[in-house]
Regions:
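Carboxylate-rich, polar loop motifs that coordinate divalent cations or form catalytic acidic clusters
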Residues: 1-253
Length: 253
């Protein structure tokens, strides 16, 4: 879900993109032969950039919707082998410099600079410990300080170092319990600057102490496969998972 600057609510589904104007829905779907239509009907991510363009991440690539023209266009990503019939886009974000970061599951991360049109591809290199930790990238988080966090489906999370144009791994292990966040499906930052990592459980990463704590739900209220997390007010997290919708009060733990 996304609410844009004009008030429209956009809803990505497995059967197209819906726009709600508070009274009516309008549905956008792929139309064979129409290059100005949405290129794929399975939506995984939505993002509005600082210029008001809507970015749509789908099961097979990225598309942009120009509101003024009411047209979709394909955003071409380089370096992705043609044999990859599916280019799943789980996350699209804009950093403080106006550059667009795109997570492509299986291919790593792409950074697009609108000012010159250049695209840089970041991928895992087994011989380079400062490369992206995995190509199975899922979510991207840009926190209030501008730090860029990249979550992966098998190697946990890493941060981008803009000074060296490289990445370093975050130790997301609760050392007391021995649990490690490795299969990250969702990320968010709370009002206190903590980073929340979600896989089959919930982990809090303290940026100041660099400690990671596993926050376990009650045994009778299990939370499995968390796909979404956000802070709806200071100290209150809303978590979407296969178990339903859960509200987590940080003060009461």
């Amino acid at each position: 879900l996304l609410q844009d600057r004009t008030g429209y609510i956009w809803c990505g589904t497995s059967d197209g993109l819906n726009r709600f104007d508070s009274r009516h829905f309008k549905t956008f779907r792929h139309i064979p032969g129409d290059t100005a239509s949405l290129g794929n009907n399975v939506i995984h991510s939505l993002f509005e950039d600082s210029k008001g363009n809507l970015w749509i991440g789908t099961e097979n690539g990225v598309f942009r919707y120009r509101v003024s023209e009411e047209k979709f266009s394909t955003f071409h990503l380089p370096d992705i082998p043609d044999r990859l019939s599916q280019k799943i886009i789980y996350s699209i974000k804009e950093d403080q410099l106006g550059k667009i970061w795109i997570s492509v599951y299986g291919s790593g991360v792409f950074r697009y600079n609108p000012s010159d049109g250049k695209i840089k591809h970041y991928s895992h290199d087994i011989n380079d410990e400062k490369s992206l930790i995995s190509n199975l990238t899922t979510k991207i988080l840009i926190d209030h300080t501008g730090d860029i966090w990249i979550a992966t489906h098998d190697q946990g999370v890493c941060k981008y170092d803009p000074f060296t144009d490289s990445f370093f791994r975050i130790d997301a292990t609760d050392k007391q319990r021995g649990y490690t966040a490795r299969y990250i499906y969702a990320l968010c930052e709370d009002s206190f600057g903590n980073i929340w990592l979600c896989d089959n459980g919930l982990f809090k990463y303290d940026k100041t102490t660099r400690n990671c704590t596993a926050c376990l739900p009650p045994a009778d209220e299990p939370i499995t496969y968390i796909h979404f997390i956000t802070e709806i007010q200071p100290g209150i997290l809303l978590i979407g998972s296969n178990s339903g919708l859960t509200q987590y009060n940080l003060a009461e733990n």
